[in-house]
Design a protein with these regions (language model features):
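Positively charged, low-complexity intrinsically disordered leader regions
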Residues: 1-41, 45
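Solvent-exposed alpha-helices and their adjacent loops that cap or buttress functional pockets
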Residues: 2-4, 11-15, 27, 50, ...
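Short beta-strand segments
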Residues: 23, 61, 156-160, 235-237, ...
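Acidic-glycine-rich active-site phosphate/pyrophosphate-binding loop
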Residues: 31-42, 117, 228-236
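Short, glycine-rich nucleotide/cofactor-binding loops
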Residues: 34-39, 162-166, 243-248
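Short, hydrophobic/aliphatic alpha-helical segments
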Residues: 35-51, 149, 153-155, 301-318
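N-terminal active-site beta-alpha-beta segment that forms phosphate/nucleotide-binding
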Residues: 49-214
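Conserved phosphate- and dinucleotide-binding cores of soluble alpha/beta proteins
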Residues: 185, 193-318
């Protein structure tokens, strides 16, 4: 992740493996803030509060949650508590349960005294694998999207599936970064993505760091942009993909898919294998969907004229 002129990952282990460093995504785009997580409870809280978010990153963060917990208590009871607390932190993203099961199944088979070292090895391995997968997604998308001429490529995306949703590179934005690196003129339409504004707060911030041209649009503007021929491709990430290809993603994704189909515009979902729910093949309406606090619709965070970050009410829900 390029921030200014320095590369970052969204999550990294400290050298002595006593804590992990994360980018506090709730502070963006107003402040770039690194915080340290030292305990299982802090990891669970960071996932629930969306200080870390994005399906792939949540999974890797959970793996580090095991490692931090094993530093204090590597017993079977501690291991079971880790699994239960982490898998219930946010239910929609299947990457979370995938990573939790991967780490738990490996640790439960080994002696307690070996679990600390192994848990850190597993977490770091999952983090590195995530980066490798995202680079591969970027290359695959690049080969799909690269034009035969040097015209501007206009791509619409919803929510945030860039660096901040993964350990690095991103899923849906990875092909965009690759196109830009190869010299193509790329312009991105960025949905604001209400109610938490991940597009406005995170995707636009990422693209700004990379110097990629972009325009933030209201969530309802996508249809008109497609109708007017101003969108060449739509690409999004995913929280969960069923075996038959059904996709669960941020609210509003379905509307973009329907309009893209109506206007004969290619619609792509970029996701690693860990986002595929191999145990699910029924109706997508039966996916467990996270229901968040209604106050997220009625409030919005912003910066006032004095540079203070404040939260304002947008209306009265009563």
């Amino acid at each position: 992740m390029l921030v200014g002129s320095k590369n970052y990952r969204t999550i990294e282990a400290s050298e002595d493996q006593s804590y992990v460093k994360i980018i506090d995504q709730t502070s963006l785009p107003f402040k770039f803030k690194i915080i340290h997580l030292r305990t299982l409870d802090e990891v669970v809280r960071a996932i629930k509060n969306m200080q870390v978010r994005g399906a792939p990153l949540i999974g890797v963060t959970a793996a580090y949650g095991f490692a931090l917990s094993m530093n204090f208590d590597s017993s079977d009871n501690s291991l079971s508590k880790c699994k239960n607390d982490l898998v219930n932190a946010r239910p929609t993203a299947v990457n979370l349960s995938w990573a939790v099961n991967q780490v738990y199944d490996a640790l439960i088979k080994c002696p307690s005294k070996e679990r600390v070292e192994l848990s850190w090895e597993l977490a770091i391995k999952l983090a590195n694998q995530d980066v490798e997968k995202n680079i591969s997604i970027g290359l695959h998308g690049y080969n799909l999207f690269k034009p035969s001429n040097k015209k501007t490529i206009n791509i619409l995306t919803h929510c945030n599936a860039g660096w901040l949703a993964t350990v690095d590179h991103g899923t849906a934005l990875s092909p965009i970064f690759k196109l830009f690196d190869e010299g193509f003129d790329v312009h991105v339409w960025v949905d604001e993505t209400r109610p938490r504004n991940q597009g406005l707060s995170l995707t636009a911030w990422e693209l700004s760091q990379y110097k990629i041209r972009h325009t933030v649009v209201t969530d309802n503007a996508g249809g008109l942009l497609m109708k007017e021929g101003l969108v060449d491709f739509v690409i999004v990430g995913a929280d969960r993909v069923a075996l038959d290809g059904q996709v669960c993603n941020k609210i509003g994704t379905y509307l973009k898919a329907v309009v893209a189909k109506e206007n004969n515009i290619p619609f792509y979902v970029a996701a690693p294998v860990s986002t595929i729910d191999i145990n699910f093949s029924g109706e997508i309406r039966n996916f467990e969907i996270e229901c968040r606090d209604p106050s997220e619709i009625m409030t919005m965070k912003g910066e006032d004229k004095l540079g203070n970050i404040i939260e304002v009410n947008l209306g009265n829900s009563t």
